[in-house]
Amino acid sequence: MTVLVKHLGVVDYVSTYEVMRAFTKERNSTTPDEIWILEHPPVFTLGLAGDAGNLHSPSNQIPLVQVDRGGEITYHGPGQIVVYLLLDLKRLGIFVKELVSRIEQALINTLADFGLVAERRSGAPGIYVSLQPGISPEWIGAKVAALGLKVSKSCSYHGLALNVATDLEAFGRIHPCGYEGLKTVDMQTLGIKDNIDTISQRLLEHLQKQLMPT
C-alpha cells in the first residue's frame, strides 16, 4: 500500500498531536499509512514515564506538554527534524521492538551519509555519537536523535527527532530522557553544514527502505 508523505513545515505541537491522535483513532484496515516530516516551535514534551522534575530550569518562553508517547522529557524546536510515523504495524508485519530497531538503523544510516558514526545504546532508545576521528571528545556519547512512540490498535504514532541545527541551550534545561548529565548535540555542532531539507530527504529515504522494503 502507498505511504502518504506530508512535508508540513513548522507547525504547532499541540494541534499536530491532536490531529495524529484523531487520525489513529479513526483509521481502519484500509487507511493508507502516513509519514509527516516537520519542525515545531520550541516546546518541551513529557511522556508517560516522565517526571516533571526533569525540567530542572523551566522557561516562560517554552511550554511543557504532557503527551501519551513512551519515554521521558524531551525538547522540540526549530532546526530539528521531527518525523511522525502513522503506520499500521499489523499490516506491515512489524512488532514494536522491531519498529524501534528499524527507526534507529535509518537514523544511523542517515548520519553515516554525512560522515558521522553513531550507535544505539542498550536500554536507552535513541542515537548517540560514537568515538571517531574529527569529533571533539566532549561530544562522544552525546545524544543526537530521540525516539518516542505510541501504539494503539496495532497502529503507531509519534516518532523520532533528529537534531540538525537546534537550540542546545534548551536541552540544558532538562535531563534528556530522564538521564541527568546526558549531553545532547546537533549535526551542525559536529561539523555538518548541509541544510535541513537535504538531511530530511535522506532520512526519509532511509526510513522508507527500513520500514517498507520492496
Curated annotation (Swiss-Prot):
Active site positions: C177 (acyl-thioester intermediate)
Recorded coiled-coil stretches: none
Sequence ranges assigned to domain BPL/LPL catalytic in this UniProt record: 29-214
Catalytic activity: octanoyl-[ACP] + L-lysyl-[protein] = N(6)-octanoyl-L-lysyl-[protein] + holo-[ACP] + H(+)
GO molecular function: lipoyl(octanoyl) transferase activity
Note: In the reaction, the free carboxyl group of octanoic acid is attached via an amide linkage to the epsilon-amino group of a specific lysine residue of lipoyl domains of lipoate-dependent enzymes.
Name the UniProt record assigns to this protein: Octanoyltransferase
Source organism of the structure: Polynucleobacter asymbioticus (strain DSM 18221 / CIP 109841 / QLW-P1DMWA-1)
